[in-house]
């Protein structure tokens, strides 16, 4: 890699952070490399190997003697210790070392937890002091009364695990010196607005300014109260100042991988950081990043949020598909994590695959609406049948998309050469990148565009609460500066995870609209989504342990 010693900040023997400012200052006059996003069709609950495909593509491009870097999200401890496991890839296409990658890395998520929870500490402490002191006593401490409404608190506590018992809690049940007695909650750390800010900030100054705008509550006159009002924004930034530098790891074949930020895509922005992409585009000829879940969720946010915030324009988008997922969308039984795969998936069924390709075609068309060249990667499994693969290739090519079969899980970079060649060719073609909406488009119209053009809905409905917030936001002069970050299930194009393929004749229900002014977007919430996932009955932590002779962790996957 083209890095100087001063730009590398070692963390042990296998991981480092990169001083993004020194790199970007030194490389300011260089042209950017090719920018590639890896997305997917609507996944099964098992996932379709998108992270594995990112690693495989990076390795394949390396085998073609291309200067390449990967840029992926840091995994949350919640899924790692739950059913899903880590997100390092698999087989011969992984980000290594796995244990460091999966168990905290350099502490970025911990820094975000401390910063976020410090905001809650400041809020609840202020509420206690305002309850116990007169205005004159507050003034003696250089404080003014914020008059926080106890039922209009926007912030929660966060923890990096899936802990359903913490979704609804009561705090402050002691005496008057034990804080206010209020209903509160915990969310998973990667859903924090601070994680979104880390993902989209262009530099430290941008991150500092965004943290100051985070709304933590409203007062009794319904005016927003920010971290700056609590005078905690500087300290929150201090907790995150090291986290702003991307983490450097590698594939199994030695290509560099930048790991930075980790917001989920169904409940947050679902992207690795803008800063990691800026660094990758300057130090390599190809920067391969990943957006969470399917193109309806992760790619849509990459397209209309991340690229808008960063100013970067992609050259190509990869859509990862598996025969397994196509069969699921075509009528096969839905696989359940932790249970044996239904036997139907091991048998040839071209009809199911062809029917499932309707979902794939929908995502191809979504990528085309962004003006980007699509490449379909068939992430090959040993149960795939030649006739099933032929059907997918025929349908994709007829739709005008490049398609490549990749066996990177089994063969590493050597199995991804066809995949890499397709991406190289796509990057050489001109594209006409354009956003789905401009920021001066009214929020209601934006939601309608996303629902109809990306999800395939007939229209949008609103609960009375959501309609009230929509009306209020229409009058907010800052609305024109905010993007739109939709929240919905990742298991269907619709809001209903049971509806597979390309659902028809449905309306997208918006039950609430949240505002994240620090991150710079509003969040329309479709369907029932929790910011705190639950831990299942057979979690991964049951199989994680430590070798007492070597001290090495075992059982992480």
From Swiss-Prot:
<keyword id="KW-0067">ATP-binding</keyword>
<dbReference type="GO" id="GO:0035999">
    <property type="term" value="P:tetrahydrofolate interconversion"/>
</dbReference>
<dbReference type="GO" id="GO:0005524">
    <property type="term" value="F:ATP binding"/>
</dbReference>
<dbReference type="InterPro" id="IPR027417">
    <property type="entry name" value="P-loop_NTPase"/>
</dbReference>
<protein>
    <recommendedName>
        <fullName>Formate--tetrahydrofolate ligase</fullName>
        <ecNumber>6.3.4.3</ecNumber>
    </recommendedName>
</protein>
<comment type="pathway">
    <text>One-carbon metabolism; tetrahydrofolate interconversion.</text>
</comment>
<dbReference type="InterPro" id="IPR020628">
    <property type="entry name" value="Formate_THF_ligase_CS"/>
</dbReference>
<comment type="similarity">
    <text>Belongs to the formate--tetrahydrofolate ligase family.</text>
</comment>
<keyword id="KW-0554">One-carbon metabolism</keyword>
<dbReference type="GO" id="GO:0004329">
    <property type="term" value="F:formate-tetrahydrofolate ligase activity"/>
</dbReference>
<dbReference type="InterPro" id="IPR000559">
    <property type="entry name" value="Formate_THF_ligase"/>
</dbReference>
<keyword id="KW-0547">Nucleotide-binding</keyword>
<dbReference type="Pfam" id="PF01268">
    <property type="entry name" value="FTHFS"/>
</dbReference>
<feature type="binding site">
    <location>
        <begin position="44"/>
        <end position="51"/>
    </location>
    <ligand>
        <name>ATP</name>
    </ligand>
</feature>
<keyword id="KW-0436">Ligase</keyword>
């Amino acid at each position: 890699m083209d890095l100087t010693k001063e730009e590398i900040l070692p963390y042990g023997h296998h991981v480092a952070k990169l001083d993004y400012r020194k790199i970007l200052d030194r490389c300011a006059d260089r042209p950017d490399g090719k920018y590639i996003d890896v997305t997917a069709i609507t996944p099964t609950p098992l996932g379709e190997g998108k992270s594995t495909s990112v690693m495989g593509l990076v390795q394949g491009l390396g085998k073609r003697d291309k200067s390449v870097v990967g840029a992926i999200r840091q995994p949350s401890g919640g899924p790692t210790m739950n059913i899903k496991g880590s997100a390092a890839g698999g087989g011969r296409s992984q980000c290594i070392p796995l244990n460091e990658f999966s168990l905290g890395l350099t502490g970025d998520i911990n820094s975000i937890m401390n910063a976020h929870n410090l905001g809650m500490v400041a809020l609840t402490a202020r509420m206690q002091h305002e309850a116990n002191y007169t205005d004159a006593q507050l003034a003696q401490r250089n404080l003014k009364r914020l008059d926080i409404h106890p039922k209009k608190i926007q912030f929660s506590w966060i923890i990096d695990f899936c802990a359903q018992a913490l979704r609804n809690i009561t705090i402050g049940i002691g005496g008057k010196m034990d804080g206010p007695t209020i209903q509160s909650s915990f969310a998973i750390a990667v859903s924090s607005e601070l994680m979104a800010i880390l993902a989209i900030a262009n530099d430290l100054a941008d991150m500092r300014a965004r943290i100051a705008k985070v709304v933590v509550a409203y007062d009794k006159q319904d005016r927003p109260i920010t971290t700056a009002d609590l005078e905690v924004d500087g300290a929150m930034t201090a907790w995150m100042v090291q986290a702003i530098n991307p983490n450097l790891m590698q594939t199994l074949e030695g290509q560099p991988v930048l790991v930075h930020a980790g917001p989920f895509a169904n409940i947050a922005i679902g992207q690795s950081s803008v800063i990691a992409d800026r660094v990758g585009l300057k130090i390599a000829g190809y920067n391969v990043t990943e957006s969470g879940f399917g193109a309806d969720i992760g790619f849509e946010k990459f397209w209309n949020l991340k690229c808008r915030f960063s100013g970067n324009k992609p050259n190509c988008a990869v859509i990862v598909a598996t025969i397994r997922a196509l069969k699921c969308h075509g009528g096969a039984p839905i696989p359940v994590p932790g249970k044996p795969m239904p036997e139907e998936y091991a048998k040839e069924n071209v009809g199911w695959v062809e029917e499932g390709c309707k979902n794939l075609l929908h995502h191809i068309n979504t990528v085309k609406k962004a003006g980007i060249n699509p490449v379909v990667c068939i992430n090959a499994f040993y149960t795939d049948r030649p006739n099933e693969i032929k059907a997918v290739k025929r349908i994709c090519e007829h739709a005008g998309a490049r398609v490549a079969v990749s066996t990177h899980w089994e063969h590493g970079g050597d199995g991804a050469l066809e995949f890499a060649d397709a991406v190289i060719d796509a990057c050489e073609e001109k594209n006409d990148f354009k956003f789905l909406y401009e920021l001066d488009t009214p929020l209601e119209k934006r939601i309608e565009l996303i629902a109809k053009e990306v999800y395939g809905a007939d229209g949008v409905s609103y609960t009375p609460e959501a309609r009230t917030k929509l009306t209020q936001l229409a009058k907010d002069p800052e609305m024109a500066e905010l993007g739109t970050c939709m929240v919905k299930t990742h298991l269907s194009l619709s809001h209903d995870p049971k509806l597979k393929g390309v659902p028809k004749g449905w309306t997208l229900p918006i039950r609430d609209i949240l505002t994240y002014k620090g991150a710079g977007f509003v969040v329309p919430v479709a369907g029932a989504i929790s910011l705190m996932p639950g831990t299942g009955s057979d979690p991964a932590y049951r199989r994680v342990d430590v070798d007492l002779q070597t001290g090495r962790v075992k059982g992480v996957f």
